[in-house]
Amino acid sequence: MKIRAGFNLGYECMQPTPMLLVLNIHPSRRADLLSDQILTFDQPIEAWSYTDVFGNACSRIVAPPGRTTISTEFEIYDSGQPDIVPDDAVQHAINDLPDDVLVFLLGSRYCDTDRLADFAWARFSSTPLGWARVQAICDFVHDHITFDYLKADVLRTAHGGFTDKAGVCRDFAHLAIALCRCMNIPARYCTGYLGDIGVPIDPNPMDFSAWFEVFLGGHWHTVDARHNTPRIGRILMGTGRDATDVAMSTAFGPATLSRFEVTTEEVPQEAGKAD
């Protein structure tokens, strides 16, 4: 299947403002592109591309005073298959984990494991190791937090989501990640596109989505505590310890987001053609 995705973002700056952007698709999905995915600017801006320590495709710019619009639109191939559920994936002993995975066991800005460890062990220590434990954590978070756009809070941590019991997709992800790490399961934050493909249309405006991945059986596996069901058509943009590492923009100076439009939709198949 084909998916068309993109965005239009507007920023208002009072002075030249350096910015870091994580707005490209993840390098692991480049081979699936059916058209170029290029960031365009409505101002004469030079962008420098680089790969961060987590392997994300990032950009550096200096936004001029006034309004700057950043946009992209592309088509990408997707298998059309839902997320894989690795029922038999085993949990590694700490000493068997690859070196580059260990960082995803540690607490981070939004995943405050030290405040959740006692609860996590009391609640999940009796569950089977491996995927069954991840699913138990996912089930808990899905039932514990109520999704509410009006309760979004960029300062809320995993423990904040635990106590507030409300939030948006990043809050589901942060709490689930923190609980997994408490139980010695490496977990990392993911951001990207997730359209209403194969599910009822959400009447709310489209947004970027957040989910997470766990390292079991030698591989990273997709998990979504907000929806708690395999979904179709994820397009990964970035991975990191938490939302800090994959913020769509980080401005080193005053910058106001004045426009935010995200699109993700399946491209109708032409009659007589198959993907």
Question: Where are the regions a protein language model picked out?
Answer:
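Short intrinsically disordered coil segments
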Residues: 24-26, 86-95, 226-230, 252-254
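Intrinsically disordered, low-complexity linkers and terminal tails enriched in Pro/Gly
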Residues: 195-197, 271-274
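Short, surface-exposed linear segments at secondary-structure transitions and domain or protein termini
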Residues: 44-47, 94-97, 230-239
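Secondary-structure boundary elements
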Residues: 13, 76-80, 86, 96-167, ...
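Hydrophobic helices that insert into or interface with lipid environments
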Residues: 238, 274-275
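Hydrophobic/aromatic-rich core segments of domains that either
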Residues: 139, 171-259
